[in-house]
Amino acid sequence: MTEKVAVLLGGTSAEREVSLLSGQAVLAGLKEAGINAHAVDTRDFPVTTLKEEGFTNVFIALHGRGGEDGTLQGVLEFLGLPYTGSGVMASALTMDKLRTKQVWQAVGLPVSPYVALDRRQYLDTEANTLLAQFTHLGLPLIVKPSREGSSVGMSKVNTLSDLPAALEEAFRHDDDVLVEKWLSGPEYTVAILGDEVLPSIRIQPAGTFYDYEAKYLSDDTQYFCPSGLSDEQEQALAALAMAAYRAVDCSGWGRVDFMLDSDDAFYLLEVNTSPGMTSHSLVPMAARQRGLTFSQLVVKILELAG
């Protein structure tokens, strides 16, 4: 049977616009390699008919809910279509930052101190009692929805008086929210391709933190690859990335994000099971450092589909 690849993009999540950019870049890379690939916007096209339309493989370029949360992966498993990235369980788990942290904690991997809060607790708890839950974390804080990507709904809190507004913003996007200790050091990210850990990247946003604008819109964010770590630090970070990736049963490809705190210790932030593939994206940057062109990278990811 002749290979016909569906590049799933767009969708209906808060990350739709980024997904459209990722998907078009992936599509161009696959076509450059001579692969019969077609863009499929899951907002408009029923994925249940992919097999009927003659597709034999799926490259998932969707971000956020409905694309990397296990839902789509379950449908593709049912259809018997090979797809890129992690399976149902790993996709569902890593979409939820709280549950991912809990798994990492259980196996002894480093995560920043945090408090989890659900909407019911938030609505039922008196304001002063609510604020008292977070005092042991110190200031500043970072507030984020548990199940959003691309820093959607995320806020930095410098004083406790700013916390209610930050919680309101996070609860606009999810019923579960994380309030974490602010880590003051630089952010690093490590891409994984099959069983290979790619070189780390150090991220230096122009603003307060690596938010949506810094990730996708700003040309002022600086990226360093090589990241400037010593060989010993690079090896330790690579080992930590792979341990975190395997602890949540990821496969195929992905990206693990870290913060380096003022105590020179790395803390895990999250795993991305369907990382961005835009002109600002990090996995292609790390792959270039290993000598892979963008087209070679997307072909390799497709070859890892299961």
From Swiss-Prot:
Gene Ontology process terms (BP): cell wall organization; peptidoglycan biosynthetic process; regulation of cell shape
Cofactor requirement: Mg(2+); Mn(2+)
Localisation per UniProt entry: Cytoplasm
Record-listed Mg(2+) 1 binding positions: D257, E270
UniProt domain ATP-grasp: residue ranges: 101-303
Catalysed reaction equations from the record: 2 D-alanine + ATP = D-alanyl-D-alanine + ADP + phosphate + H(+)
Chief location of this protein within or outside the cell: cytoplasm
Organism superkingdom: Bacteria
One GO location term (cellular component): cytosol
E.C. no: 6.3.2.4
SUPFAM superfamilies xrefs: Glutathione synthetase ATP-binding domain-like, PreATP-grasp domain
Keyword flag Cytoplasm: yes
GO MF term list: ATP binding; D-alanine-D-alanine ligase activity; metal ion binding
Keywords, sorted A to Z: ATP-binding, Cell shape, Cell wall biogenesis/degradation, Cytoplasm, Ligase, Magnesium, Manganese, Metal-binding, Nucleotide-binding, Peptidoglycan synthesis
UniProt pathway: Cell wall biogenesis; peptidoglycan biosynthesis
Binding site for Mg(2+) 2: E270, N272
Entry binding sites for ATP: 134-189
Cofactor binding annotation: Binds 2 magnesium or manganese ions per subunit.
Family stated for the protein in its record: Belongs to the D-alanine--D-alanine ligase family.
Role noted for this protein: Cell wall formation.
Protein name: D-alanine--D-alanine ligase
Native source organism of the sequence: Pectobacterium atrosepticum (strain SCRI 1043 / ATCC BAA-672)
Lineage: Bacteria, Pseudomonadati, Pseudomonadota, Gammaproteobacteria, Enterobacterales
